[in-house]
Amino acid sequence: MSSRLGAVPATSGPTTFKQQRSTRIVGAKNSRTQCSIKDNSFQYTIPHDDSLSGSSSASSCEPVSDFPASFRKSTYWMKMRRIKPAATSHVEGSGGVSAKGKRKPRQEEDEDYREFPQKKHKLYGRKQRPKTQPNPKSQARRIRKEPPVYAAGSLEEQWYLEIVDKGSVSCPTCQAVGRKTIEGLKKHMENCKQEMFTCHHCGKQLRSLAGMKYHVMANHNSLPILKAGDEIDEPSERERLRTVLKRLGKLRCMRESCSSSFTSIMGYLYHVRKCGKGAAELEKMTLKCHHCGKPYRSKAGLAYHLRSEHGPISFFPESGQPECLKEMNLESKSGGRVQRRSAKIAVYHLQELASAELAKEWPKRKVLQDLVPDDRKLKYTRPGLPTFSQEVLHKWKTDIKKYHRIQCPNQGCEAVYSSVSGLKAHLGSCTLGNFVAGKYKCLLCQKEFVSESGVKYHINSVHAEDWFVVNPTTTKSFEKLMKIKQRQQEEEKRRQQHRSRRSLRRRQQPGIELPETELSLRVGKDQRRNNEELVVSASCKEPEQEPVPAQFQKVKPPKTNHKRGRK
């Protein structure tokens, strides 16, 4: 004992404790020394080693008598250093090793954990986990299935290799059905060639007529419907394509090298005509303008070119129209959407106006868009509107933001509006204010309206056929015509005023002249009466004649044979 650990001096106090500590570290390094504590005092136990000592009677070293018996360590300090307090147990027989310094087994630790769960958690750093029972299902799922084994060179092995390579295997009987598993393929082969319906395009077998129709519609939609004489029935074909598009949502090109799909019938048909064709064939299919020879790929492009560059296409009669335009008209009537009754009536009126009047008077560069009337061509007068200062407008806008409404500023008017534009329109027709703007007046029937939208609606609904004046004396511009009409009305008013003044003067002339003989007075009165009758008859006949412009008209006084002052 003294040869391995060294002699411990028989001194008391702190020096003895340091020596004991150093010897304990040396024993830990050799990993053959175990430390045990008995009655809160240190005791060293050295395992039996035959190579070092020949005696077998020394199973444990003697206790150190010099270590003070009163020196004790706390239980918490010993537990922090994983030093278990020694228990009263007898040392085993010769050659046995004392188990006092060994770690407790798992069962004893669990018992200590039940007594001190928090300290156990702090000392050993073990977390409390709930006891879980193993799930038999999860264990069963984890079992990996072994790949099926088939005989070498059998059909099952060939099918399995094809499924691994391509993902599916086709039926060897019909070559139209594919399956992803060998079991599914065998199940199909039991009923193969027993279905009632077979596709005559690809040979696929189906169990029901509805399934066959859907298969043909979805996979063979490019095949046209033929008549008795092998002619394509366009209405039936369009109806079939419309049904396919409604159910599937798209039409796909059936060429193997093309994967295009379309959401409209026109786009699909346009693609089918040109898909897979060479440049020479596409060049033959182009449409050329008969005026300038410019080529176009579509009829819509050619129609736009003719409208914008070579005048309106509707001015041509049916016999004089080019073949391309006739085809366009027939296509728009036969296929596509059905026109409404109002649209047909409008087209009829436009064509009638264009063919009858506009082709004669308008320039050749006019287009069909000029047939649509705009504000300048509307036959109504606009009244003047009052002007407002910026301060007033700013005040109105502020009131709208605060109170969300504006009241009419005129006294006695309780009109309320939620916008500045509405208040402006109201002030133009409000009779309680200083400004009276007037009303909108239709020049065709002299009817008055409060708002501009009202007079526009009136003209569009009542005078729909009177957009353009159909009169041989009309000019090319509607504005010039309106100016001439205004001038004629002013001249007519001037004539009436002039006639009324002349009649008043003639009536006042006998009172101003000097008294004459009775004979001369009678003759003068008779002549005046005759002259007045002539003037009245002439005034009655004048409105029946066409009005003559003022610049070509000369006012001539009526000729009379009576001379003043002559007997």
Curated annotation (Swiss-Prot):
Q: List the transmembrane segments.
A: none
The keyword Zinc is assigned to this record: yes
| Gene3D superfamilies, per the entry | Classic Zinc Finger
Basic and acidic residues: compositionally biased ranges = 523-532
Q: Could you tell me where the Polar residues compositional bias lies?
A: 12-23
Question: Residue spans with biased composition (Basic residues)?
Answer: 119-130, 495-508, 556-567
Q: Where are the zinc fingers (C2H2-type)?
A: 197-220, 287-310, 406-430, 440-463
Output the SUPFAM superfamilies linked to this UniProt entry: beta-beta-alpha zinc fingers
Q: Where in the cell is it found?
A: Nucleus
Under Pfam families, the record lists: zf-C2H2, ZNF512_C2HC, ZNF512_zf-C2H2
Q: Name one GO molecular function term.
A: DNA-binding transcription factor activity
* Gene Ontology CC terms: nucleus
Give the matching PROSITE patterns. Answer: ZINC_FINGER_C2H2_1, ZINC_FINGER_C2H2_2
Family designation: Belongs to the krueppel C2H2-type zinc-finger protein family.
Q: What does this chain do?
A: May be involved in transcriptional regulation.
The molecule here is called Zinc finger protein 512
Question: Which taxonomic lineage is given here?
Answer: Eukaryota, Metazoa, Chordata, Craniata, Vertebrata
